[in-house]
Amino acid sequence: MKVGNEFSLTEIVRADSLDDIESARSLFKEYAAWLEIDLCFQDFEKELSELPGEYAPPDGRLLLAFVNKSLAGCIALRKIGEGVCEMKRLFVRPEFRGKRLGRGLAEAIIRNAKQIGYKRMRLDTLPPKMNDAIGLYQSLGFKEIEPYYQNPVPGAIFMELDLGSESPAEARASLKKGPDEPAT
């Protein structure tokens, strides 16, 4: 998927090559450092060493975002149950934040989840560090749910999106379309 204007070109691609996987590994490490939380409870070191691991097709996806050919962000999804996937590792490098790149990555991974055939997408997030992300998730239609796994980090929030229904953004987009135009 490419989005751009005369000043910048944003491209979101599947991480398929060995170079892509190394780029994802680098971003995952930046993400963990930015969080300032020990992710050993998620078996993070194993996840890094086995990339793409659970994020590999057919049940998973690993996407990278580039702005003017510079690596800017990532996102992933993995299967966690029958018809249920989990969004993981949404991260945008600080110099690329505020440009709706996180939204673009989240929307792309949601489309991928629907194409795979998932019915629900879950995630966990950490306020206050991720307050902007929480607002993004809510705008995409995610609702807060009970914990679906044991997260030892105090204050973790768990959310879920019904992939069978339109997100608020999709609903607004379809209202702007003519009666015979499909919503995209």
What is each stretch, according to the model?
Residues 15-88, 93-94, 106-108, 112, ...:
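Acetyl-CoA-dependent GNAT
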Residues 137-146:
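Conserved acetyl-CoA-binding loop of GNAT-fold acetyltransferases
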Residues 69, 100, 117:
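Conserved G/P- and acidic residue-centered "switch" motifs that form tight phosphate/ATP-binding loops
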Residues 93-99, 128:
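Active-site acidic-Proline motif in GNAT/NAT acetyltransferases
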Residues 123-133, 150-154:
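Conserved beta-strand-loop-alpha-helix junction that forms the acyl-donor binding cleft
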Residues 113-125:
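Conserved GNAT acetyl-CoA-binding A-motif
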Residues 2-6, 155-184:
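Terminal substrate-recognition subdomain of acyl/acetyltransferases
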Residues 99, 103, 107:
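Residues forming the Rossmann-fold NAD(P)(H) cofactor-binding site
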